[in-house]
């Protein structure tokens, strides 16, 4: 012992290896190490989660603001080039189209060359990961870099391609959360904990939404509604704390950079507070919600059908498999050509950015009444003080411009969602819903130019309020969420229309959820990601179907008295990840679970220790240290399909064994559950 420690016998200090003493400045190094250990002990006394959640929120706010800053500079450069290039139509057309074509081609090629999983929104994959499914490479740091660069190029195209950043930013936030989780595990020195990892990933999803819209409350609620069917209340404080840190930091950076005078909402509105709406208007808001619900059904169906067509069509599937940048360039040419301002783009306010779309649509003045007796000229450049004039063209009324915008953007947005680039799809549908509400409000303002009279008081029609309700209702119906109502309040700074907006969102969701899966669930279906379909309502009879009707009866068990040769045959002939352990071959009483990896490792380790002629059995392998797991949860043959589905969703399970009077008789996995639910919802035709 004296040759491996550097202290004399009886020394009061801790033993130190001689290797440490041979290094330079051993005493200083020990003092620094002791000070760091003391600081770590004091800091982590209140809980180490606080520090990592603060780091998560601050980091994502910095990344979000830096991206916005860089993208804003690039977009302004594009506008300057288009403005200064002259009056030649060919040069102006090329400056308008070549710019987004080059950016989208680079975004697609760069992100796909690094990792194919960086394309798309990322929310469907994150939703799958939070259910307990392991998706390789989706949370790697190289995916993070590809997503950041690709998303920046996508957003730099402006409103020409009409895409956002919410989905990819949620994916980026979850990647950072996963990385911080690994750092936390090494710092604290505790073993990996799957539960804590999922808690941090859930907080990361909330931070992603909060740092895009600077809306912490709706960010947490939206991430809960989109990402999970069951959510632990224990995770609430993590999500709210990290989201608040991120949103506050985002606002703080805007103030420090003189973009805002103080902390305010992103899209400022000025609705009157005295009488914001009257009771008869509730009916109109509900009707608007119903219209948004019907249109959202059509949008989700067309978008999902388009993705199916691209995958099944021979030409497009080959093009997407071999030349993704070429497909992106072709789609960008189509979209940029249509939005070219001197062309048909002048009838859809194509010179406005995504934020300017919302600022103008939320205007509380009625454009129809303001232009009723006059037709304002179409200026050569947008007027920053009167951006709403972009929606008014001498050759078309306000109603014609809004209708043309809705018709064209419907299929253009579907086309944009098929481009294999990192992009978000929530902000475009939010803007689209605002345009629906604006059109509805303008019609009402024309029908009731003096306002609605009720109880002797006059309540004027504010189209901006209907635009706010339409944005929340349409986006909520497309994503099957209710928190979009709160998101609309947070980004606009208005809550005077809380009741009518919420009723519109409820009406839209009631229609869309009855007939179509959500946008993200539809993408999961198209990409064939692992998922559990919802059991909607009691009419399908899920409470009457028991596990015995749909379980997998082919079950390979390992008995404790099974000879070693048979154990090896079972391992070689099967590829399952775990085996049910039974007491004896005859009784088949389930007593535990053996992981395949542990069993194979024990077989390799113990095979050399057996004497010639000895006939070992599985019990000997287990006695020599092969770990087993207790059966903490099992199903009965009489358990209903509804209860089984709830267990799998609540506990993020992948497989459960079925017993009858203690005997192992089968197993249930996602495959059996999905097949049983599909049989109930779409019963086979009678023979």
Swiss-Prot record:
GO CC annotations, alphabetized: basolateral plasma membrane; chloride channel complex; plasma membrane
One GO BP annotation of this record: renal absorption
Membrane-traversing stretches: 51-82, 91-111, 141-160, 161-180, 236-255, 282-310, 325-342, 400-420, 421-440, 500-520
Keywords noted in UniProt: Calcium, CBS domain, Cell membrane, Chloride, Chloride channel, Glycoprotein, Ion channel, Ion transport, Membrane, Metal-binding, Repeat, Transmembrane, Transmembrane helix, Transport, Voltage-gated channel
Primary location recorded for the protein, binned into one broad class: membrane
Superkingdom in the source lineage: Eukaryota
Cellular compartment(s): Basolateral cell membrane
SMART domains (UniProt xref): CBS (SM00116)
Induction: Expression is consitently weaker in the absence of BSND protein expression than it is in its presence. The half-life with BSND protein is much longer than that without it. Rapidly degraded without BSND protein, exhibiting a very short half-life of less than 1 hour.
Intramembrane stretches listed in the entry: 116-127, 203-224, 349-360, 464-496
Catalytic activity annotation: chloride(in) = chloride(out); iodide(out) = iodide(in); nitrate(in) = nitrate(out); bromide(in) = bromide(out)
Post-translational modification: N-glycosylated.
Annotated glycan sites: 193
Residues annotated as binding chloride: 121, 426
Residues exposed to the Cytoplasmic side: 1-50, 521-687
Binding site for Ca(2+): 259, 261, 278, 281
Tissue expression summary: Expressed predominantly in the kidney. Expressed in all segments of the nephron examined, including the S2 segment and the glomerulus.
Sequence ranges assigned to domain CBS in this UniProt record: 551-609, 626-687
Membrane-topology annotation of the record: Multi-pass membrane protein
InterPro entries: CBS_dom, CBS_dom_sf, Cl-channel_core, Cl_channel-K, Cl_channel_volt-gated, ClC
GO molecular function: chloride channel activity; metal ion binding; voltage-gated chloride channel activity
Described purpose of this protein according to its UniProt entry: Anion-selective channel permeable to small monovalent anions with ion selectivity for chloride > bromide > nitrate > iodide. Forms a homodimeric channel where each subunit has its own ion conduction pathway. May conduct double-barreled currents controlled by two types of gates, two fast gates that control each subunit independently and a slow common gate that opens and shuts off both subunits simultaneously. Assembles with the regulatory subunit BSND/Barttin for sorting at the basolateral plasma membrane domain and functional switch to the ion conducting state.
Record-stated family: Belongs to the chloride channel (TC 2.A.49) family. CLCNKB subfamily.
Subunit structure: Homodimer. Interacts with BSND.
Record-given protein name: Chloride channel protein ClC-Kb
Gene name for this UniProt entry: Clcnkb
